[in-house]
């Protein structure tokens, strides 16, 4: 399966979200949907923050595609973060080698549904050694 197929199958669809991205911990976008594409600089910032101090995201926020999301919840032990920007939101899960970002843009998908879908993608990759 290509990296893009993980985004398409785990992060996009009814009850999952409207998109997402997989980036490396050193930066670099492995796969992304059109509506959730971090720039090269953004992917490095997210990957570095998640690799070193994910709790710091609450102070800095997360920028994806030029949009800044306020981080509302972090669990440093689990390597997770949740963020909002108006009706939009993101779920972030860190694996050994990557950061999985789930994205939703309206009330048709709840933050909980998006977080669950993002977790399932991250868990699948962790079980595969990523």
From Swiss-Prot:
Decide whether keyword Nucleus is in the record.
Answer: no
Can you cite an annotated GO cellular component? phagocytic vesicle
Note the Gene3D superfamilies from the entry: Dynein light chain 2a, cytoplasmic
Task: Enumerate the Pfam families for this protein.
Answer: Profilin
- Give the signal sequence positions: none
Localization recorded for this chain is:
Cytoplasm, Cytoskeleton; Cell projection, Phagocytic cup; Cytoplasmic vesicle, Phagosome
Where are the bilayer-spanning segments?
Answer: none
Question: What's the superkingdom here?
Answer: Eukaryota
SUPFAM superfamilies, from UniProt? Profilin (actin-binding protein)
Q: How does it assemble?
A: Interacts with actin. Interacts with RHO1 (GTP-bound form).
Function, as annotated: Binds to actin and affects the structure of the cytoskeleton. At high concentrations, profilin prevents the polymerization of actin, whereas it enhances it at low concentrations. By binding to PIP2, it inhibits the formation of IP3 and DG.
Q: Which family does it belong to?
A: Belongs to the profilin family.
- Name the record gives this protein: Profilin-1
